[in-house]
């Protein structure tokens, strides 16, 4: 079985005829689990799909259900390490133990938060959460599709892509398609906000566009529960360019409006191909440019919706 696309092919071939993956290719991330590793006597680990500051996500194969899945491993860089080719992780310092354990509990809480929405078409499905190799793993569905960031890039190939810049154009979509995507996103957010959960890390990287055109929200690693009648101190977790000013402070109150601000930024970016001025910078000098000043076809009413 190919450890990249998980298709079956004859043993005499070293190159997968379906995706071109070469058997025995070293992992791009040295500290990632070696392809072919079996977790919980059931899940065959494949190649890395993505990696961030708190975890590594792999494509995998469920030998019991015989389906392709995704597995997210708790791996906070800076706190832990792994000898290449081995399975257990080790702390980079003994003093890291409390922080690591607290983070792993938060990782497990992420799985529980996601599992609440397994009946929803707008949130990635979670099948299980297990602990092994000194860490934890979230077993979830493998989504056939692309991130919103990738989707915009592919559908508008003639424009330059530049990260987090308010002065240089990224790619953009039509008004109609931009509104369709944002409306679907708002529908999903209404569900998770109804359970008292805020995502806190919304961006085109965490929105998947499926082959049928629907969307799924992924990566709830920064998600937190909120109470409408209380003020709670929260850790500073934010996505630069998409975060409201209150997200820069541990003591500021955060609620569903934190996510709604990010939705406004995403809509602004889809319509104009640019990111607006960051919220924190606007506190000292508000230089926000209206979407219609960048893209003349945008009507005034849509300006009001975006900047509200």
What are these regions (language model features)?
Residues 181-182:
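Activation segment signature within eukaryotic-like protein kinase domains
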Residues 185-197:
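Protein kinase catalytic-loop region centered on the HRD/HxD motif
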Residues 128-129:
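Activation-segment/catalytic-loop signature of the eukaryotic protein kinase fold
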Residues 133-147, 151:
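Conserved short submotifs of the Hanks-type protein kinase catalytic core
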Residues 83-117:
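AlphaC helix of the eukaryotic protein kinase fold
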Residues 241-308:
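C-terminal lobe helix-coil module of Hanks-type protein kinase domains
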Residues 148-173:
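AlphaC helix of the protein kinase catalytic domain
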